[in-house]
Swiss-Prot record:
HAMAP family: HSP90 (MF_00505). It comes from Oryza sativa subsp. japonica. GO terms for biological process: cellular response to heat; protein folding; protein stabilization. The lineage of its organism: Eukaryota, Viridiplantae, Streptophyta, Embryophyta, Tracheophyta. It holds the Pfam family HSP90. Molecular chaperone that promotes the maturation, structural maintenance and proper regulation of specific target proteins involved for instance in cell cycle control and signal transduction. Undergoes a functional cycle that is linked to its ATPase activity. This cycle probably induces conformational changes in the client proteins, thereby causing their activation. Interacts dynamically with various co-chaperones that modulate its substrate recognition, ATPase cycle and chaperone function. This is Heat shock protein 81-2. PROSITE patterns: HSP90. Belongs to the heat shock protein 90 family.
Amino acid sequence: MASETETFAFQAEINQLLSLIINTFYSNKEIFLRELISNSSDALDKIRFESLTDKSKLDAQPELFIHIVPDKASNTLSIIDSGVGMTKSDLVNNLGTIARSGTKEFMEALAAGADVSMIGQFGVGFYSAYLVAERVVVTTKHNDDEQYVWESQAGGSFTVTRDTSGEQLGRGTKITLYLKDDQLEYLEERRLKDLVKKHSEFISYPISLWTEKTTEKEISDDEDEEEKKDAEEGKVEDVDEEKEEKEKKKKKIKEVSHEWNVMNKQKPIWLRKPEEITKEEYAAFYKSLTNDWEEHLAVKHFSVEGQLEFKAILFVPKRAPFDLFDTRKKQNNIKLYVRRVFIMDNCEELIPEWLSFVKGIVDSEDLPLNISREMLQQNKILKVIRKNLVKKCVELFFEIAENKEDYNKFYEAFSKNLKLGIHEDSTNRTKIAELLRYHSTKSGDELTSLKDYVTRMKEGQSEIYYITGESKKAVENSPFLEKLKKKGYEVLYMVDAIDEYAVGQLKEFEGKKLVSATKEGLKLDESEDEKKRQEELKEKFEGLCKVIKEVLGDKVEKVVVSDRVVDSPCCLVTGEYGWTANMERIMKAQALRDSSMAGYMSSKKTMEINPENSIMDELRKRADADKNDKSVKDLVMLLFETALLTSGFSLEDPNTFGTRIHRMLKLGLSIDEDESAEADADMPPLEDDAGESKMEEVD
């Protein structure tokens, strides 16, 4: 009896993706097979993992396999696996009604000219079936549900039916592709064998092709007569007696038989010696492991022997995946095998988060086969393996660094990871620090390492100077650099948000302290004459410092005469152990931040004034003449707010700041306030009735 068929609509994004796949011309449609085999392999991994703790999970189908069946009579290609299978809700959700996080990103990538072969990286590889098929039928059986059939011609909807009459799978999934008329090449044995060799040779389950075998068999005429007896029956023939007496002649007939032909007979690549493996073989293995369409950037193949034995191959990709730092997604990076048996992927205990971009496999001789995720967390063997993997990864990065061009590519993609490593990995911190690269006041367009910086340090220089900020452009003309540049000191530009965290942990390099140009405590060597002049200026400007402090109140902790600013009138520095302006900006941008922390970490600002600046000198004269002069207060507020901006802070009230600038423009243009009073009706006055500067209210 036919079961009831339910119809579902594809989720909008998936529908959009399908229409892109069907209606756009792609030259490399062949990748569909790689994607479907990869999905089968994942399903087999899942059932194998489940069976480690419960052997009965394999009862319905003890063999783990992938079968490929081309059928020229019906123009269909089927890919069958004995994996975990799907329940009805899996079918509905995974194949149509719930879009993966990667669906939108993949479409954006396609629109930007990316290759369709990227599809697997975005978790939507199944839909590549529609590159070659006009109709797709998925029959599946999960241990916890009945057998179901999913079917769609990608016209906006799909159907799901309980399968009571079809061939029963026992467990697993069969995907049948009804090929388009111009895609019948994928029924050819040669083409399918080539594709498996090219893309899926290193899948760890046997991939068998249903092949047609034609053999020639010799039979005598006698046997032939026997075989034809039925056909001949009822016919009247004249038998030539002479012929009958002649020697029976032999004749050949063609016999057609079918058999399974295993296409991936390679032994695991990691068991072979590195020197015997070609670059192409590593590339093929990397692609089958990661679904990447590009080759890897670098590879490390090694084995550890002694008290502990394991083999590993680690790869560094050429690009960072689109969701590298997506904390909701478990990165599927290192596959764990125990004595050639696959145990699990995304084994978080094998590699720290900062190395989450490294792909590869680890095959251990010592772990128990039935190890669970819970046991992994406590496992001492795993901790030793992890330590070795981290060490080998760092070695690999140094190998990449030997080629400047390769390292620039690597650094562009994964510098954030290295900086996260500085923050998280205290054991390897000093080693990772050697891999960091920054622009600096002397490096031009090139990046420089800390090691190179140290070799260029001036005689007598004992500290490494750096400045943090939003971008290279934002910091290269910062007032904080004026004195350092004038004295010929090199300053590193740390303009990545994560630099703030990294430099907080990396307090020194090769015995040289890292000092921020934007914080208190910047001490530059001065001659006796310079020191004497500085003392005189401090005395001369002491009165102005007090006036500024009175005007600004608790907006600043103190006001001092600067020895770091050369051209700008003033700047705002932060405490040595508090947040920099850049860090404050980063923390404000975090939606889920703990605002209580901001109170004590965003340290009080110190205003440093430049006594050599003509604006400051004029301000000093006015303040000395009359400290209650309203223009002094207005100018102090304007200087403070401008210093907030040039020092990298944000304004609490940009509108009042704007109003103040407009007033200054009017003064400069000699526009009478009364004439423009009507136009300015909605502007706050600079002075209120009490004679207090409105500007003071800006915080």
